[in-house]
Amino acid sequence: MDKRYSVLMSVYKKERPEYLHAALKSMTGQSWRPSEIVLVCDGPLTTELEAVLKDAEFHSLLKTVRLEKNAGLGAALAKGLPECSCEWVARMDSDDIAASNRCEKQLRYLETYPETDVLSGTIAEFQGDFRKKC
């Protein structure tokens, strides 16, 4: 099975840097590591968000696409999708934290059921301290 996949995310200036950091860390810590993380900057970002993007922990996987002004999630993802180089794309929001085996489980499912076009999963929501589930 081809384990290559891209991750597609969008971020804009009102996002919390600690959430973006946790989201990126959850993807770089996958049991099957992504080939790339395509991150669309939907307009100018804060200094704190820019610092997260420069973190060496993510730098080798991060492919940044920048929009001059905020265009909204749909437009940002439409710009980012053609930049993804893999057949399979895992979608993440900049405040999502993925289980460490999320992508492995999803890719194994796709291997078993190759007729699948779109695949999702369950979520656990959090408020405030993202290390604690609601």
Segment roles from a protein language model:
Residues 1-134:
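Nucleotide-sugar donor-binding/catalytic module of glycosyltransferases
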